């Protein structure tokens, strides 16, 4: 169990909740697996709904990644602040990326 908790903390260190992506960085992260399951953590970083920031759901990105690593599933997660809310708006980068993974 301590190894899993340590790995969870390592994975969450990649998520900068409040920060927009820097030059050359992606606001969305993903892991590819072979198991036909996709784990999604769309609110892993601060996101914006109707012009207002909404707090991140801490450690959801890391949990999605950890479970993906353990099961060889796919994972898609927010890793930097987003000007959109992928669970609220239809045509946003997160959903476009999700569509490419499941296609």
For the regions a language model picked out, list residue spans one by one.
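N-terminal catalytic or cofactor-binding beta/alpha core of small enzyme domains
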Residues: 1-103
């Amino acid at each position: 169990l301590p190894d899993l908790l340590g790995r969870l903390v390592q994975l969450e260190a990649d998520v900068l909740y409040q920060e927009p992506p820097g030059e050359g960085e992606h606001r969305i992260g993903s892991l590819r697996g072979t198991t036909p399951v996709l784990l999604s953590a769309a609110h892993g970083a601060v996101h914006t709904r109707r012009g207002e920031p909404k707090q991140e759901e801490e450690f959801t990105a890391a949990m999605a990644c950890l479970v993906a690593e353990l099961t060889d599933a796919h994972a898609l997660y927010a890793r930097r602040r987003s000007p959109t809310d992928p669970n609220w708006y239809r045509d946003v980068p997160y959903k476009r990326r999700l569509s490419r993974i499941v296609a």
